[in-house]
Amino acid sequence: MFYNTLIKIYSKSDPNSYIKSIYADVQPYLKSIMFEDGFEINITRRVFCDIENSISIHSYMEIENEKYKVMDIKKWDSYMEVYLYKLKRQV
């Protein structure tokens, strides 16, 4: 893994909720999540990074001036995988 992409972490989609920046390995990813009412969203990015306590399923991230919502997190021994949904409305 190459931690060569700068990621800004936010507690909300609001730019004033900035927490910190980290470097991570960001990869394209495609998975759909279907909800009961037929609503579907696509997970389009997967982030690999060191375990970071400031990242939760309530977090938002900014990568290359685009905002994402954290949808899922898988923690391993020494790193974590974070699955992201690209926001349609860039706040």
Residue ranges and their predicted role:
Residues 1-48, 72-91:
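N-terminal disorder-to-order initiation segments that are Gly/Lys/Arg-biased
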Residues 50-55:
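Short, surface-exposed secondary-structure edge patches
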Residues 63-65:
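Structural motif
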Residues 68-70:
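Short, isolated positions in well-ordered beta-strands
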